[in-house]
Curated annotation (Swiss-Prot):
This is Membrane protein insertase YidC. It is a multi-pass membrane protein. PANTHER family: CYTOCHROME C OXIDASE ASSEMBLY PROTEIN COX18, MITOCHONDRIAL (PTHR12428:SF65), OXA1 (PTHR12428). GO terms for molecular function: membrane insertase activity. It comes from Prochlorococcus marinus subsp. pastoris (strain CCMP1986 / NIES-2087 / MED4). The gene is yidC. The keyword Manganese does not apply. Disulfide bonds: none annotated.
Length: 379
């Protein structure tokens, strides 16, 4: 599904924006904003639900304890009362469904920006070398790798897969050819010969694991040396991997600290990611009663995540997407926090802010009043 969304939805949008302004950096920004706007109703539902639960949770927990204690000998009545409580305040899991629905699109967006044209595309093939007396008993099963769209010009791209007709198991001293081809069955090298710059996108073949068990030539010919496991990597250069944008030297550049030197553009992007994440956390807590534990978590979480991304190998283009997405998320949170709350939740919040912490009676109901984003209505 992720590959389908990437190829049929995200890459065409990317092509459209690049056609308007020939800058892959601007195309990333535009693609991110368009997808975030399209997902606005779903992410807004999650933010609203989280805001509602943050206010109602203390009251819900107290009422749940009272119900369980009062009807401990009557499970049916207990479930009935707990159901009424959920209807009154909403389920704590209500915000999960919108998140789950939008996840495939976000994963596809992430995968698109990690691949061609923004970064080099690796094909990793895990192989197993067996003794000759065992390989004869193996029923060969053809292998096909996941497909990746390879850009050879700004407007020309096609899906490419790696194939092994006899599968990933081979006998000692046996040689096999790993084929790169389009999903239509055309040989990748022959397709590249139709482009003036085609040789630029020929793969580099390496043994990333198990070099004592196997070797590979630069035309993809694999030769088994002795029994064991091995991994072959074919890496195809990304068209825009070395293209810059603003202060970013190369959108495909990976790593904060490489070969003894600091990549300050990567460091700046990671720092911007942390600051925008912190801003979003701060905005989500605005207008809420002070909570020392939650406040500490809101400060520590961005620091931990930011520190992780300093050493997590993400291309600069992906980090650019994450910063833009965080800015959009912070703006969205700011807008949604301005919406009016249902009357019963507003009363709970007012009591929390004034230190009363009163529990409202169970007759309070939001189901027949208004949605969280609607203004106060008078009947």
């Amino acid at each position: 599904m992720i590959g389908f969304i990437s190829e049929k939805l995200l890459i065409p949008i990317l092509d459209f924006f690049y056609g308007l302004v020939p800058s892959y950096g601007l195309a990333i920004v535009a693609l991110t904003v368009v997808i975030r706007i399209a997902l606005f109703p779903l992410s807004a539902g999650s933010i609203r639900s989280a805001r509602r639960m943050k206010i109602a949770q203390p009251v819900m927990q107290k009422r749940q304890a009272e119900i369980k204690s009062k009807f401990s000998s009557d499970p049916k009545k207990q479930q009935e009362e707990l159901g009424k409580l959920m209807n009154e305040f909403g389920s704590p899991l209500a915000g999960c469904l919108p998140l789950i629905v939008q996840m495939p699109v976000l994963f596809a967006l992430f995968a698109t920006l990690r691949g061609s044209p923004f970064a080099d595309v690796p094909y990793n093939i895990n192989l197993k070398v067996l003794p000759q007396d065992q390989i004869a008993a193996i029923d060969p099963k053809p292998y096909k790798s996941p497909r990746h769209s390879i850009f050879v010009t700004e407007k020309s791209h096609f899906p490419v897969i790696a194939t092994l007709p006899n599968g990933t198991k081979l006998g000692s001293e046996e040689s096999v050819k790993i084929n790169l081809q389009t999903t239509n069955g055309n040989n990748y090298s022959e397709v590249l010969s139709n482009y003036d710059n085609g040789s630029r996108f020929l793969p580099t073949w390496t043994v990333s694991k198990g070099s004592e068990n196997i070797k590979v030539s630069q035309d993809g010919l694999v030769t088994a040396i002795k029994p064991g496991d091995a991994t072959i990597e074919a890496k195809i250069p990304g068209l825009a991997a070395k293209s810059g944008f603003l202060f970013i030297k190369a959108l495909g550049q990976v790593g904060f600290y490489v070969d003894g030197s600091i990549n300050w553009d990567i460091a700046t992007l990671v720092g911007a990611f942390g600051l925008t994440l912190l801003l979003s956390q701060v905005l989500s807590s605005q207008g809420m009663p002070s909570n020392a534990q939650q406040s500490t978590a809101n400060k520590i979480t961005p620091v931990m995540i930011t520190g992780m991304f300093l050493f997590f190998p993400l291309p600069a283009g992906v980090l650019l997407y994450m910063v833009v997405a965080n800015i959009f998320q912070a703006f969205q949170t700011f807008l949604l926090n301005k919406e009016a709350l249902p009357a019963n939740l507003q009363k709970i919040l007012d009591d929390q802010l004034t230190g009363k912490n009163k529990v409202i009676p169970s007759t309070a109901n939001i189901s027949d009043k208004r949605l969280p984003f609607e203004p106060n209505n008078k009947k």
